Amino acid sequence: MAERFFSTKPSSGGENLRRDNLTLLSGPISSGKTSLLFQFALSVASASENNRVVFICHRKRIESNPPFLSQGIDPSSDVFNRIQRKYVDGDEGIRKYFAAFHLHIDLPSAVVIDDFDDYFTQFLSSWIRNSKGTLMNSRARDMAMVRTLALCHNAILDANKKAACEVVLSETNPGDSPRSLFIYKRWIPTISTIKGDGDGSFLLRSNGSSFEKSAKYSIAL
């Protein structure tokens, strides 16, 4: 999985490789996660003229901090036309999208969700109390994430009965592992983590169900 965040060229025999349907990309702030996700979208879209990718993101954030393109990529390439940006403001919008996923006549080859965890920050910025006055904001957030991931998981499993489709989402994590790891592991088989490696360099490690790969990259200008 790690190489698909960097290369736009499909690897030889790539169609025969086992790919998990859901992948999480977790790393610290300003580690190039959005750029890696967009590079992944380019990789999928470049593999075939029939491939389409839906890139779900916050409009203001993507416009103020657009993803970087790797060297050698032609910004005027037709492949960009096969990547559709879908602007979503809250977690309900993500659930509505996947609830209607089975109605799509032309299913995308991949769905990418940038800053997935940020769609649930409203639960941490407001105080939600139960009948006894106990703070319930963290629990409400966890339940909303579970509902969203479950809906996404079921939608992708159903879609793969018709054609190959996968979901890759990212989250910002200041520590060594995703903040909601116990939730993600229930629904997502492959978790790719990013760690700083000094001087603007980062180490990306992908842990799948049967393999582990790593890659080093830099976003220093």
Language model: regions and residue ranges:
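N-terminal regions of ATP-driven nucleic-acid and macromolecular assemblies
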Residues: 1-221
